[in-house]
């Protein structure tokens, strides 16, 4: 009888562990031409301490020195040694990079999908506890308004969908980064959600918005610019654009066991009351003056985050 109880207990523990869940925080953040210079590190440290994300999908790294600086002096500050970086492709003036919690993920591969003005970076990660493979497409699309720039953005999304339509419902993936999209009417934005020839590969946006993002009714989703004055090469003009995105595969949007938490999508520091204002204009109802100043001085973008259950 006692032996049978031990066997039953073992099976219950094994069953429970096989269905254990892990909540992962994913953040996309444009770092504004970040390099080996440490002048802005103090500001980024405050932002990162507040976020404490498991994965950072970043844009505008100027060089490999910038990757090392962000990894060693900001993410792994005080010799924490929690994060690793993916292989860095130094191909343009500014490039994308990925940083991840080595205790939660193993990097399987890094590759690029050719694009204009820069490639899409694809990272394949394995979630250690569940062994599920997670695909991240890190993108920094062509900036500026105008039909020619819209066409270049749309062409790059076509290249992305050519890849993702080869996937199926067993693939978990997101597209994140600085999309530089001004409106839901843009061809690039619409292409994310069109049905493909295979029936797979489209994306989902948790944000419910229609038309131009430069509108006070969408103030709470704006990510650029947290500044009204121009300095350090960044954009000014106050918060009035949604340029930074995280989009989700059907498997994450409608998943039962692996999915993202819909009410977790957030723009750090944006309380919805700073349309065309600097993020550190007080009052700010969601962050302190110190953190608002750090967000203001670190970059001309605000970080976007979401939680995913594995």
Model-derived segments and spans:
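Sec/Tat signal peptide C-region and signal peptidase I cleavage site
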Residues: 16-20
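Sec-dependent N-terminal signal peptides
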Residues: 4-14
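Divalent cation-coordinating acidic motifs and surrounding scaffolds
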Residues: 21-310
